[in-house]
Design a protein with these regions (language model features):
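Bacterial N-terminal signal peptides
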Residues: 1-5
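Short hydrophobic alpha-helices and adjacent helix-cap/hinge residues
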Residues: 8-154
Length: 154
């Protein structure tokens, strides 16, 4: 399900954003409205995701979100890149019942915090782990083929 990438763009940030958007595209969110992806405390990542959403013609909106305003948000998905795993978990717990699909690039163990934890392997490719407990609590359905691609450990 991954799109071929131009070799000049084949870097880890590009791959993380494309992987995030690809997983999101294989997810069935609870509502039928346009999906809002909120990026916590990282306007640069917001800008990059907006660029790739436009380039790949996805119908998502993206906004930067300060973690202080997390509870009052209307986000169907959230992207953490600088937030520690424990704080990710606390923020997600504060919005319990909203069904938020969460992604992180700052959660190597993936035991608490985000549902999908993206990382760069020692060979330079992008992979991810899945926290199945968080996924089941979110009540968001993700195509099982995506879950089969997750890595248990490097």
């Amino acid at each position: 399900f991954f799109l071929p990438c131009n070799s000049t763009l084949a870097n880890s940030s590009y791959n993380v954003y494309i992987t995030t958007l690809s997983i999101l595209s294989y997810s069935q969110l609870a509502n039928n409205k346009a999906t809002t992806l909120c990026v916590v405390n990282n306007p640069v990542a917001t800008s990059q995701l907006q660029h790739y959403i436009g380039e790949l013609n996805y119908h998502y909106s993206v906004k930067t979100l300060n973690d202080n305003h997390f509870v009052s948000t209307q986000c169907e998905a959230v992207f953490f890149s600088t937030t520690p795993p424990l704080q990710q978990q606390q923020l997600l717990n504060s919005s319990e019942g909203q069904g938020i699909l969460s992604f992180s690039t700052n959660n190597p163990e993936c035991e608490i915090g985000s549902t999908f934890c993206l990382y760069t392997t020692t060979r330079g490719s992008t992979s991810f782990k899945v926290n199945l407990d968080n996924l089941s609590r979110s009540k968001i359905r993700v195509d099982p083929r995506v879950l089969l691609l997750a890595k248990k450990a490097e």
